[in-house]
């Protein structure tokens, strides 16, 4: 006979646990009572990791450094050197080489790449398609699908023998649809002599991933979209066309595909289109134009702006822009996308007296909030419906993060001869003598804001990574970075679970990557 477990021995619902103690969470996981599916188990593990990282005695120690003559890239536990030719894994205690691709001439080097994570909700026909891959664009117009772990070529597509595609990979819908665009077409000398107008601005190809499938290739014609059109991009199913007059127009890409696609093309199959025959995606045929836009699609949205373009996001939908007038320089306007109405308190102005401008963007945590950051202040803003009026909105400050400033001490300096001199001018907000914010990142798995602040000591910039709670803004931890921070060179900092990666451009146009790993003190043994 099998005895039924008593009610006390049954697994409690995962959502009812309130303990924040890491030891208790580890014990619950060991006993199997923390969750009944992988998603909840992962969330529990990340909660434990967050608690460990934020402990006072937890440190981050530099474990590895490597220099490069070309730009260094990082994404999802992988560090790429030499134009994506060499890949190192940062998931181990020290980074190790995952793969190294054969050297190629400059005409075949990788110029851009996207990391494609494997889909969890779909089972694909081929096992190789179920794993993460690196999508690369080479200088000779080849699109390669490489294994993210071995560098093995899984698939390749030739784009065009007529148009040059360069440094132009981007996500339309993240991990679902991507696009690649050609460089802008310029009128040749022969065309000018013959009086022929070249109205083709560029070509844009859209693909689906997992498995790799062609959506279509389209031409951006100035006769259709306007003579002032200068650039395009795809994002969230919207084709955005920018104009030299600081105007942006948005069009539905789904509408364009449904109305103007003349034929659905399949990679690797024979095709006869536009008076040419070949295999789609093979050289020299490439990918022909199968989306022929002969009339302007309906405009979903248009806006003129002063600088930095237009951003769309938030809950409900809003957009951020700077009106196209000099008097609005330095301000950011938050407006409803429904009717264009400016939100109450929607004009955000840092009033920064600094060399570097402030920056603003929608929070990547999908909360609909806005991050507005300057050299001394970071404001986290919320879009709220006005009291008693559901169709009008106002911008309120959720919380602010401020840098430590001593205005009195900053007015007096001591010269090399020992004389005390009082400043005759006000210090800039990003003066090297003061603590200054340089960047703000969001660690989604740990729900932490990572803020880089810079201070100066002994004529060298010293950087620290501050970890703030994403919900309250409370400062949880400071992590010093060992290498000096020279503001005249470009820097990038990534915070990914238990790893901090700092890439920096150094003198002589060389680059260096520094990797820090979480370290706990050794437990006392009896």
From Swiss-Prot:
InterPro entries named among the record's database cross-references: DCAF17 (IPR031620)
Transmembrane segments: 200-220, 237-257
Keywords: Membrane, Nucleus, Transmembrane, Transmembrane helix, Ubl conjugation pathway
Annotated localization: Membrane; Nucleus, Nucleolus
UniProt membrane topology term: Multi-pass membrane protein
Main location: membrane
Protein's pathway: Protein modification; protein ubiquitination
Any one GO biological process: protein ubiquitination
GO terms for cellular component: Cul4-RING E3 ubiquitin ligase complex; membrane; nucleolus
Keyword Translocase set for record: no
Protein name (Swiss-Prot/TrEMBL): DDB1- and CUL4-associated factor 17
